[in-house]
Amino acid sequence: MILSVSRRTDIPAFYSDWFFKQLEQGFVLVPNPIAHEKIAKVALEPLKIENVETNLLGEKKVEISGNIEGIVFWTKNPKPMLNKLNKLKDFKYYFLYTLNAYPKEIEVNLPPLDERIESFKILSKYCPVIWRYDPILVTEGIDENWHIEKFEYLTKALKGYSKHCKISFLIESYKGCDKNLHKPSIWQKDKILSAISKIAKKNGFQIEACAENGYSKYGILPSKCIDGEIFEKLLTEKYKDLNIQVKRKNNKLDGQRKNCLCMPSVDIGQYDTCFHDCKYCYA
């Protein structure tokens, strides 16, 4: 099982102490996001290889314990969790770090940009960090040229600390989206994608689209944020002589967008508990 921490709120930013208490007790109780009276108990035991036996034909029989194949953290501010990451030594994990350069009027309660960039660099010493530049939106004072300028600044700042950047465009229909924020027009999208794909390549980043397709002409391919292949790579690094595969299912979870390629996961967050107060909230 892949644990999602969390699409619904920013646990690293606001609830890191709570999260590690759940790890210590070995399980977490998760209310159903729709039917709150329904509570799921989710075990939190890291996947471990307990024993490997090899028969006369050279075939390996592997005994595995634990249920968590990996953890995906979603955050805009991992700083409160940075001094606790040693507690994750038995788990495989990576971070999806949303890092934009929007003004305080849009991303109200985030730390200063330079501080968030520094946190990104520190975090990258512990685990893979995937940069999310999303959602891309336009409003008064923020147009396609603004995005190109800010993206270049961020790309240069993060060069060498990550290799992947996931993008998506604003979804205006989300209930948390301010009516003054808009999705770029077709020609604005074309200009943005043309420019940032070149900037990314120059600085060692591969841009990938989250739940969107049709950008292959820019060298931008669809991708999955919750990616079993990343965990297979991490597990293979630890157990080099074993071919470990993360369990995959093709079925989508409720709420996943049409073009979302994420593998199923269990999310342990709760809606309406994030205090960033972003004016485009997509939780």
Where are these regions (language model features)?
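Conserved Radical SAM active-site core
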Residues: 1-107, 113, 117-122, 283
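Active-site beta-loop-alpha junctions enriched in small/polar residues
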Residues: 8-10, 76-78, 98-102, 134-138, ...
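Surface-exposed cleft-lining segments at the edges of enzyme active sites
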Residues: 102-111, 134-145, 177-185
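Conserved C-terminal portion of the radical SAM core fold
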Residues: 115-176, 195-211
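A C-terminal junction/extension of Radical SAM enzymes
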Residues: 188-258
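Local cysteine-cluster metal-coordination motifs and their immediate loop/turn environment
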Residues: 258, 266-283
